Amino acid sequence: MFDLSWSEIALVGVVALIVIGPKDLPNVLRTAGKWVRKIRSLGSEFQRQMDDVMRETGAEDVRRQVTTLARTDVGRKIDQAIDPDGKLAASLSSVPPPSPAGPFGTSPAAPPSLPPQAPAQPVPPATGAAPPSPSAGPDRRTDGSLPPQD
C-alpha cells in the first residue's frame, strides 16, 4: 500500500528505536497496531453497508445491465438498424466509375479547337552575328559604325 521496501522499514524501525527508546517501543507498537486494526474494521464495515444499500435499491441490477451493455457492440447494432442489408456501406466504400455523359445526360462541351495556322515567317538559324541594334539606321552598320563616305 505504501510501497515500502524492507530496507526502508528497517530504517523506520531503527529511527523509532532511537527516538522512542527501547523501553517504550513495545507499548507504542501495540498502540499503533490497535489503531490500524480499528481503521481496517471501520473500512470493512463501511464497505458492507454500501453493499447492503446497493442490494436494497436495486443498484446491483443496474450495475449488471451496464456491464452487459459494455460487453455488447453498440456500434454494430446501430449500423444494423440503419443499413440492415449493407448496401449503403457498400455504396459509400466503392467509388463509381466516371460517366462519359455530363450531369444532365448530355456530353460535356468540347473545348473550342482552333484551326492550325502556319507560322508567319520562318525562323532563321542562329549564325553568331549580332542582331541589328535599335540605333542602327540606314546610314549605320550593324556594329554601330558609320559606312565610309564616298
Swiss-Prot record:
Entry-linked Pfam families: TatA_B_E
Main subcellular localisation: membrane
Keyword Cell inner membrane in annotation: yes
A GO cellular component entry from the record: TAT protein transport complex
Annotated membrane topology: Single-pass membrane protein
Compartments in which it is found: Cell inner membrane
Keywords: Cell inner membrane, Cell membrane, Membrane, Protein transport, Translocation, Transmembrane, Transmembrane helix, Transport
Function: Part of the twin-arginine translocation (Tat) system that transports large folded proteins containing a characteristic twin-arginine motif in their signal peptide across membranes. Together with TatC, TatB is part of a receptor directly interacting with Tat signal peptides. TatB may form an oligomeric binding site that transiently accommodates folded Tat precursor proteins before their translocation.
Family: Belongs to the TatB family.
Protein name: Sec-independent protein translocase protein TatB
Organism: Rhodospirillum rubrum (strain ATCC 11170 / ATH 1.1.1 / DSM 467 / LMG 4362 / NCIMB 8255 / S1)
